[in-house]
Amino acid sequence: MGKKVVGELKLQIPAGKANPSPPVGPALGQRSVNIMEFCKAFNERTKDMGDFNIPVIITIYQDKSFTFITKKPPVTDLIKKAAKITKGSDNPLKNKVGKLTSKQLEEIAQTKMEDLNASDIEAAKKIVAGSARSMGIEIQD
């Protein structure tokens, strides 16, 4: 029989920069998990992922051990990097803050494909395009 799961946490932590300060420390400390052990393991696994925030799902077991799964960076972070902007538009219908080509859309969709709820690359591109439009980014063919 496997270990008994007592909790699951979802956090977004900068790649390679996990430390015991909030939000990591308090979230893990409440569940009596070894914070430094998690930080070292997370930083080692994400050191080559650039400066993105990385979504992580931490499964905590009854014996206070843990496992974690890292996901790909959020679509909005990938879009901001591709469009070379720091934040989306405050009014996406009126103010356009950047442009993306369909090739860039496809690259983002390929990167994020395993995390998206899409059956093929075309559906993934539509999801990414919708996120880009809601940020005030124009899509060019």
UniProtKB/Swiss-Prot annotation:
The keyword Ribosomal protein applies. Pfam families: Ribosomal_L11, Ribosomal_L11_N. Gene3D superfamilies: Ribosomal protein L11, C-terminal domain, Ribosomal protein L11/L12, N-terminal domain. GO terms for cellular component: cytosolic large ribosomal subunit. PROSITE patterns: RIBOSOMAL_L11. Keywords: Methylation, Ribonucleoprotein, Ribosomal protein, RNA-binding, rRNA-binding. GO terms for molecular function: large ribosomal subunit rRNA binding; structural constituent of ribosome. Belongs to the universal ribosomal protein uL11 family. Part of the ribosomal stalk of the 50S ribosomal subunit. Interacts with L10 and the large rRNA to form the base of the stalk. L10 forms an elongated spine to which L12 dimers bind in a sequential fashion forming a multimeric L10(L12)X complex. NCBIfam families: L11_bact. Forms part of the ribosomal stalk which helps the ribosome interact with GTP-bound translation factors. This is Large ribosomal subunit protein uL11. The gene is rplK.
